Design a protein with these regions (language model features):
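Helix-to-loop junctions at the C-terminal end of transmembrane segments
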Residues: 50-63, 147
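Extracytoplasmic gate region of multi-pass secondary transporters
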Residues: 1-52
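Multi-pass alpha-helical transporter architecture, strongest
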Residues: 158-175
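Small/hydrophobic positions within alpha-helical transmembrane segments
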Residues: 10, 42, 46, 75, ...
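Intracellular helix-loop hinge segments at the cytoplasmic ends of transmembrane helices
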Residues: 24, 107-116
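C-terminal transmembrane helical hairpin of 12-TM major facilitator-type secondary transporters
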Residues: 62-109
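A late C-terminal transmembrane helix in Major Facilitator Superfamily
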Residues: 118-152, 159
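Juxtamembrane helix-start elements in MFS-like secondary transporters
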Residues: 32-40, 91, 121, 125
Length: 175
């Protein structure tokens, strides 16, 4: 459970930083302020739709849930890498992948934990949710520090690295 909490911490750190810094980064890559707000709205809509679709797939298709989460985290990491390129088009594609996959995994993850630890759902999800909350709080702080000292591209690559780490950790832990 502690390893799963670390996975959620890394994933939430990267994803929550995206929500915090995406508009200022959109301006930095060439969008005006109004368009940057629309970019955030698009990302949020992608995240909402993706969460609903992922939930329906998890309910109906009965996939390996942790593998599904790992795929979502992996796709999210690609999105974060694209955000780092600093071009308006790749930024938009990265945003769609980042929100659509990289921040849509928590519901499926909680479902997987509840299914895997059916005899102690409350304890198991309490531990893994602790990772989410620690990561969600620490991610924007880390992103801001990296962006301040090394630039926004380095901060997005750091988030990409956290997502990749979460993906690899989850693939190892799920065995």
């Amino acid at each position: 459970l502690v390893a799963l909490a670390a996975v959620t911490g890394m994933g939430a750190a990267a994803a929550n930083a995206m929500g915090t810094f995406v508009t200022i980064s959109a301006v930095d890559v060439g969008y005006d302020e109004a368009a940057a707000g629309l970019v955030l709205a698009l990302g949020s809509a992608c995240g909402l739709i993706s969460r609903l679709v992922a939930g329906a797939v998890a309910d109906r298709a009965r996939p390996d849930l942790l593998r599904m989460v790992a795929i979502m985290l992996g796709l999210g990491s690609v999105g974060f890498g694209l955000l780092a390129l600093g071009h308006p088009v790749t930024f938009l594609v990265g945003l769609i992948l980042g929100f659509g996959a990289g921040w849509a995994w928590p519901g499926v993850f909680n479902y997987a934990v509840a299914a895997r630890f059916a005899d102690r759902v409350a304890t198991a999800t309490s531990v893994t949710q602790t990772g989410v909350y620690v990561g969600a709080a620490a991610g924007p702080l880390l992103f801001g520090l990296v962006a301040e000292h090394f630039g926004a591209s380095a901060a997005w690559l750091t988030s990409c690295g956290m997502m990749i780490t979460a993906t690899v950790m989850l693939l190892v832990v799920r065995r």
